[in-house]
A protein has these predicted regions:
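Acidic, low-complexity intrinsically disordered regions
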Residues: 13, 44, 60, 83-84, ...
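P-loop NTPase motor domains
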Residues: 25-38, 141, 145, 150-434, ...
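Conserved ATP-driven motor cores of ASCE-family P-loop NTPases powering translocation/secretion/packaging/pilus
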Residues: 426-529
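Glycine-centered flexibility motif
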Residues: 49, 138-139, 273, 442, ...
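Basic- and hydrophobic-enriched, low-structure N-terminal and domain-boundary segments
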Residues: 1-162, 166-169, 497, 570-572
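A short glycine-/small-residue-rich loop at the edge of a beta-strand within enzyme catalytic domains
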Residues: 20, 378, 413, 453, ...
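Intrinsic disorder/low-complexity segments enriched in polar/charged and small flexible residues
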Residues: 19, 50, 66, 89-90, ...
């Protein structure tokens, strides 16, 4: 028979320390009565040693009066009241325990995570000129709030219906001191935070697929981003990445040539002051060489020559390149989408969005799109990149970093914001005061967008990584289990025989996983694991917005903008 004992839960040690504590408390009660009682009755204290005093009282050689008894009772009541008060406070500030909380006691705590607690985080923020501690992460199991600082970037992996929006996205948006950019495929995050954010700055909602049923009251010109051939290539990459179906087969030649062709047409339209609709027009007229002349006149002869070569290619080859390019730019065929990226018609009033102006204030931009066929994801990605790069330009102009950090909450990043270069740029943005939080539903989602090595690079570049449960990918969970580490326990074996009687042996070198794959796959709702640079993995309790300090403000925003709540309240 063998019984494992985790060293963090040594029963014998608990009993020993409990006895010591009881002796100390009894000593305090006794000596308080002895010393104070003697002072009140004018008697002299015959012993300063509590043990000697107790022996004296028992033998009758040391004074003990009615006053001593009363004082001892009062001290006992005060100590009991204090203990009850501390217990009640802990009970009031803690959530019900779960099956993984015992494992949490063997993970990061105390000095290991002190830099994420409010006091240390606030001191670090003030060094950067910011008066708030950072993005809220969660609370420790003992109830202390943890924050991600204003130089950190985050990656979160939460499975479906695990509370990522209520516990991470919304609290992070509300905590932002400067501009905010949010991507999503649902309207809930907009309804919950719009009313709060509009009190500090302008709110822009980009909703070309009517996710939140928001009308096109403004527009953005994607070609305003295209200032040279490099930016044109970047924009073409966003179209290519955002339009490609998961698992779709690609041809290296046609894909590359189509992307170059699309980039050339984007550059030509931008340099000629044309709307983005002209790009798709050129893609449907395979022998139209208007763009070739524009590129030559704009000083891009090599790019013009490349376009001319594609136009002059054999019909099948030319058709293949143009066909792939049209597929990449497919979102430009939607009239609803084009309303958001083309100038207003005569008599129509729609303000033009300017990324450089946006990042200078405490403004908010919500970027909404659906995934799948007809997605506006390429434009969501393009506008996201335009805003982040505008923030970077401002940071450089200000000496290296933004005075008020900008928060980019990339919720559903793998579905609606497929920014291929993000892993290569991630760690750089934190130093600029651009705080990016990429939220995924699984590790494999990231692999689809960035590839296996790209996803590893993104994960490694993040200062704060949060796993919120709900994932069943054993390889990923196995790596998390290894990062969390092992606990050491003693194995007690008792054997018996008629000849020698019973014998007891202890093996103190046993190890096991603190949380194994099955534990992580079944992580209870309300619990998450935080991996912070320089600290052990930490078990935390998630804090939904409705239990936080901004609950009333969020409820007011929902009452104003959430159609379901408006109907429930008797509205239209």
């Amino acid at each position: 028979m063998s019984t494992p004992h985790k060293r963090g839960f040594n029963t014998e040690a608990f009993v020993i320390w409990g006895i010591i504590a009881l002796i100390l408390v009894a000593g305090i009660i006794f000596y308080s009565g002895y010393a104070v009682g003697a002072a009140l009755t004018g008697q002299s204290i015959t012993a300063w040693n509590p043990v000697a005093a107790m022996i004296g009282v028992i033998r009758g050689t040391a004074p003990w009066s009615m006053a001593s008894t009363v004082v001892s009772i009062v001290v006992a009541v005060l100590l009991l009241g204090g203990a009850v008060g501390l217990w009640w406070r802990k009970l009031a500030t803690s959530t019900p325990s779960t099956r993984v909380d015992k494992a949490g006691s063997m993970m990061g705590s105390g000095a290991d995570i002190a830099f994420m607690r409010e006091k240390a985080a606030l001191n670090d923020a003030r060094r950067l000129g910011v008066d708030s501690p950072g993005l809220p992460i969660a609370k420790t199991l003992s109830g202390q709030m943890l924050y991600s600082g204003w130089e950190n970037v985050c990656v979160d992996i939460w499975g479906p219906r695990t509370g990522k929006t209520t516990s991470r996205a919304i609290p992070g948006i509300l905590a932002a001191p400067g501009a905010v950019l949010v991507t999503s495929n649902k309207r809930d995050v907009v309804d919950a935070t719009r009313g709060v954010r509009e009190q500090v700055g302008d709110v822009w909602i980009f909703d070309p697929q009517a996710v939140a049923a928001h009308p096109a009251t403004w527009w953005w010109n994607p070609l305003s981003y295209v200032t040279d051939e490099v930016k044109a290539q970047n924009l073409a990459e966003h179209f290519a990445s955002g339009s490609r179906e998961e698992g779709a087969r690609t041809d290296a030649f046609f894909d590359s040539a189509a992307k170059d062709l699309l980039a050339a047409f984007l550059l030509a339209a931008a340099k000629d002051g044309q709307p983005i609709t002209r790009v798709y027009r050129w893609l449907t007229r395979e022998t139209d060489d208007e763009a070739v002349g524009i590129l030559k006149d704009a000083g891009y002869p090599q790019i013009a020559q490349n376009v001319d070569g594609i136009i002059s290619a054999p019909d099948k080859q030319r058709g293949g390149v143009f066909g792939v390019a049209r597929q990449m730019a497919n979102c430009l065929t939607s009239a609803a989408v084009l309303k958001w990226v083309t100038p207003p018609e005569e008599g129509e009033v729609r303000e033009e969005f300017n990324a450089r102006d946006f990042v200078r204030g405490r403004n908010t931009l919500f970027l909404l799109s659906k995934e799948g066929a007809g997605t506006a994801g390429p434009l969501v990605t393009a506008l996201t990149v335009a805003v982040v790069e505008a923030a970077e330009e401002l940071a450089v102009a200000l000496g290296g970093r933004l005075r008020l950090p900008m928060v980019a909450m990339l919720d559903e990043a793998a579905n609606v914001c497929r920014w291929r270069e993000l892993p290569n740029l991630y760690s750089h943005y934190g130093s600029r005061g651009i705080v990016i939080c990429t939220i995924l539903q699984s590790w494999s989602q990231g692999v689809v967008v960035w590839g296996r090595e790209g996803m590893r690079k993104l994960w490694s570049a993040a200062n704060i990584k949060v796993y919120g449960g709900g994932v069943s990918e054993t390889e990923f969970l196995g790596e998390l289990s290894q990062l969390i580490g092992d606990y050491v326990y003693s194995n007690v074996s008792v054997s018996s025989s008629r000849q020698s009687g019973s014998s007891r042996s202890v093996d103190n070198d046993r190890k096991d996983k603190i949380l194994d794959v099955s534990d992580l796959a079944a992580l209870p709702r309300g619990r998450a694991v935080v991996f912070a640079s320089g600290a052990p993995a930490t078990m935390v309790q998630t804090i939904p917005w409705y239990t936080g300090p901004d609950a009333a403000a969020v409820k007011a925003s929902l009452a104003k903008y959430d159609p379901a709540q408006q109907l429930a309240n008797g509205g239209a």
